[in-house]
Amino acid sequence: MKRLLLLAGEESGAIYARRIAARAKELFPGVEVRGYGEYGFTTADLAVFGFWEVLKRIFFFLRVRRTMERAIDEWRPDAVCTVDYPGMNLRLAAYAKSKGIRAVHVVCPQVWAWHRGRIPKIEASLDALCCFFPFEPSFFRAGFAHFVGHPLAEEFAAGDARRGERAGDPRLVALLPGSRLGEIRGILPTLLEAVRGLDCRCVIPAANAQARAEIEREVERWRGAGAGCPPVDVRVGGAREAFAEAACAAVASGTATLEAAFAHCPTVLVYRVGRILAFFARRLIKIKHVGLANIVWECCHSGDDPSGGASDPLGGYPMLELLQEDMTVKNVRKSIENFISDDKLRLIASSRLAEATDLMRTDGDSISKIVRFLV
C-alpha cells in the first residue's frame, strides 16, 4: 500500500484516524496518508450539530463531497479508510469502491439502534466494516463486519486490575458538554447551574482551542448570573486525566462517555437535541439507552432484570442517563450530589463500568487489525 486516504470528520474519529495513520506508516514504510485536512477542511468545519445546522450549511457539505470525490479520482489512493461520521464518509467510501478502490469503514453505524433498512446499502458500499462492540457484526452478512475490539481498551488497565481501586478527589466533578459548539451552548449552561451552590470543584476539558473559548464564554455568563459558583478549571485536552482524578462526571453522549467508562469514573450521561430531531428520534430509535456502556451491559445481561430495584439510583445499569426533558438542573444536581456524597454508590458504578468495558476487549491490537483490513 502506497497511498491511503484516511477520513474522519469529527475530533472523536480523528483521534482514531491519527493512530491508524501512525500504524500504517509502521507497517507500510513510505505510505503517503492524506485526509480532509490536506484538502482544506478541518474537524471544526465538519463537526456540525443538529438538523438545522446541517441544512444551513448544505452547500458547504456539497462542496466537501465534490472536492473529496475529485481527490479520489485524481490521487487514486490504494485504499480509503473512513472513520465514523457516516453521513459523509459512507458516501465517499461508496464512491471509492465504485472506482475499484478498497473501502473500509471504522466504527459501525448504529443500525442496532435505528434504520436497519440501511444494512444492505452499507454492505454494498464497503469491502469491510470494523466494529468496536462485540454485538455489532451479527447484524451483517458473515465475513463483512469484524469485531476488532475497542481501541480505548488497550489504553486502560483491564477492569479486574482496577475494579474498586479509584482514588479520585471526592469533591472534584468533571463536566464534559461535548466538542461541538452547538452542544456546548445547549448543554453546558445546565451543567454549570447544576453545580451552583455545591461543595465541589469542577474541571472542564475542552476538545480544542475553539471549544475552550466557547466554554470560557459560557462560564463567564454563569458567574455573572449569581453567587455560589464553585471553582472551575477550563483546559484544552486532559479528559482522561480528569476522569481519573474526579469523583464523578457529567458527560454529553459521545466518545467521552466511553473514556469515562474505561476510567471507571461514575458518570451521569446527559444529552438534549432540538425538538424536530427529538421528534423523529423517538419514532426511529429502537433501543432504551444511548450510552454505549449501558447498551453493552444490557446485551450481555439479556434475560436478567437489570432494574436494580427502586433503591438503585443507577437503575441497575453502569451509567445514569438524563436525556431531553430529563436533563434538568434539578436532576443533574441530584445525580452529582449522590455521587460526591455516597462512597458506596461510586464503588457500585465503578464496578459496573469495569465489567461493561471488559466486554469490549479482544486479543491483539485493534488498530493493527484495522490497518490489515486495508490491504
What are these regions, as identified by a protein language model?
Residues 1-375:
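Nucleotide-activated sugar donor-binding and catalytic core shared by glycosyltransferases
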